Design a protein with these regions (language model features):
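N-terminal, charge-rich interaction modules
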Residues: 1-25
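A structural micro-motif recognizing beta-strand termini
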Residues: 28-29, 41-46, 103-105
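Short, charged beta-turn/beta-strand-edge "cap" motif at the junction between a beta-strand
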Residues: 31, 45-46, 62-65
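Short, well-ordered loop/turn sites that connect or cap secondary structure elements
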Residues: 49-51, 57-58, 109-111
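Short, conserved beta-turn/loop elements at beta-strand boundaries and strand-helix junctions
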Residues: 62-63, 70-75
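Short, solvent-exposed secondary-structure boundary/capping segments
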Residues: 73-84
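Helix-rich interaction surfaces within compact, conserved domain-sized segments
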Residues: 89-112
Length: 112
């Protein structure tokens, strides 16, 4: 079941450096200018449900699966289009607004 879809409209200059560390920071297309340099800016269409453990995320050429969801992650996503995906292999729980994922390969972030 699809719970949301979005289109990447801008990739901040520092966003790929974060990806190298296993972190993808999303903000909606209304994000303040000072946050856009390190973020992936996306146009969120509609949200049909919440991100939960087991949710599958298709991101460009990669398939991710949610293993932990921080307690305010869904609220931030719904209200701000803000989502922090951590796609590293650590086993620690997700922090407040984070969503931890396993992946088949690291995503290649592209506009579109």
């Amino acid at each position: 079941m699809q719970i949301y879809s979005s289109e990447i409209v801008r990739i901040g200059d520092q966003a790929k450096l974060f990806l190298d560390e296993g972190i993808i920071v999303f903000f909606g297309d209304n994000a303040p200018e000072e946050l856009q340099d390190f973020a992936v800016i996306h146009k969120l269409e509609q949200i049909f449900g919440e991100i939960v453990i087991g949710t599958k995320i298709n991101l460009s050429d990669a398939n991710l699966e949610v293993v932990s969801v921080g307690p305010v992650a869904n609220e931030n996503f719904k209200n701000l289009g803000h989502l922090v995906l951590k796609v590293d292999s650590s086993t620690e729980e997700a922090q407040l607004g984070d969503v931890k994922c396993t992946f088949d390969k690291k995503p290649n972030i592209e506009i579109g």
